[in-house]
Amino acid sequence: MKKRIACLLSFLLSLYTCTALARHQQLMHNVYDTQESQSKVNEILSAVSFHGNELSYGERIAEISSRFLGTPYQAHTLIGSSLMQERLVTNPSTVDCFTFIDYVRSMAHASSWQTYVSELVKTRYTNGMIDFTGRKHFFTDWAVTSPRNAQDVTQDISPYTITVNKRLNQKNK
């Protein structure tokens, strides 16, 4: 009986490993980046790792975001629409206000290029699926869709707030 359980566990572990590897390969195939992008991310991650575990999360955010000072602004850097397949773009050499936040948050949770890419998917897309309709197009999406990357503190700031649910510019296929 123990031998059967061990074989079953071994099989399940192998299956999980193969599935995870296939998902990682599919993810990396769908990444739109450049050697310059990888170099910049690795440079920032290296600078942050220099401090080891001494930095709080807020200090990590401050350290990473300071590395973007002087980075040129560029709108419409992401690839994907209702007519074009979504690609995971990572180009920290030019940012808009949203990609800046995506990159900083993702780097704050990463220790390598691979973990950065995984974190970017979790940050930018609902349920980690690279898809235009699942992209978090609005900052409020960070507080209400999984995984949650932000917390709505509006009611903590003022007792006079009201909640109004509206469907604004919902992206469709």
Named regions from a protein language model:
Residues 68-173:
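Acidic/His-rich structured neighborhood in mature extracellular/periplasmic domains
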Residues 1-4:
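Positively charged n-region of N-terminal signal peptides that target proteins for export
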